[in-house]
Amino acid sequence: MTTSQVLHPRWADTLMYVYEKSPNENNQNKSQIMEGLSGNCPATHCRELISHPALGRHSGTIATHQGSVYSDISSPETGRQCPAPQTSSSASLSYGYPFGNPYYGCRLSHSHNVNLQQKPCSYHPAEKYAETSSALPTEELSSRAKEFAFYPSLASSYQAVPGYLDMSVVPSISVHPEPRHDALIPMEGYQHWALSNGWDGQVYCSKEQTQSSHLWKSPFPDVVPLQPEVSSYRRGRKKRVPYTKIQLKELEKEYAASKFITKDKRRRISATTNLSERQVTIWFQNRRVKEKKFVSKSKTNNHMHT
């Protein structure tokens, strides 16, 4: 038997329950099936179809579209409507799904004789994820039925389990952005690899997007591209300043007296030649290395001649 239930006309969206009953079930369970709409769903195949808000104004076409998929069988309780909550129409829930197919089917297990109030492992009650806002008081939230929109999870904090579709069940009551609660909805025939390139995939974008000035060519031959300015504060090798003849004569005189310089001698030479003590020390070091190379080269030449 297929039963279509449409909510109160003042609700902006349409909630349709389709029940598929096995042939061995009798008609006495019809009343229990209808009670499943208020929260106690019997052990039958239950599919919840939630429409897109943009399709709310075409509620008449939804039933026509579903008629091509599910054949409606007339029954005495077909026209029974869900009890409308005692709330104003301005406090109606709104939800949106901007991606792809606006319907998601949820199938409950037929072999387990449990209702939704017993909280099976794959069931998450609506009260757990209800978020309150300033627009609706707490009494109205508890009195009316909760509606949820299913969104693909953009970021999940748990490992994806094969056989379960990674979805997010979020109430659309709150308008401010809040972290969505993730839920596992069992889906039949679901392949985990089919969504490997879905929302969880990361797109790499290089941050280094530099443009070389020498590669730029102007369409006009007279235009010369601007070259990048060389920084005047670039730290490089200091320009070498040659010593004067008077300074070199004084240094050679002290070196002839002693190849190694003392602290007092370095201060005296620095004051006489107007050089820093560091310059005097470096000059003596270079002078010793130069003499060592000269001696080594002289020995090599003498050895070759002999």
Curated annotation (Swiss-Prot):
The UniProt record lists the keyword Transcription regulation: yes
DNA-binding region in chain numbering: 236-295
One biological process term in Gene Ontology: regulation of transcription by RNA polymerase II
Molecular-function annotations in GO: DNA-binding transcription factor activity, RNA polymerase II-specific; RNA polymerase II cis-regulatory region sequence-specific DNA binding
Gene3D superfamilies cross-referenced by the UniProt entry: Homeodomain-like (1.10.10.60)
UniProt key word Coiled coil: no
Reported function: Sequence-specific transcription factor which is part of a developmental regulatory system that provides cells with specific positional identities on the anterior-posterior axis.
Record's protein name: Homeobox protein Hox-C13a
Species this chain originates from: Danio rerio (Zebrafish)
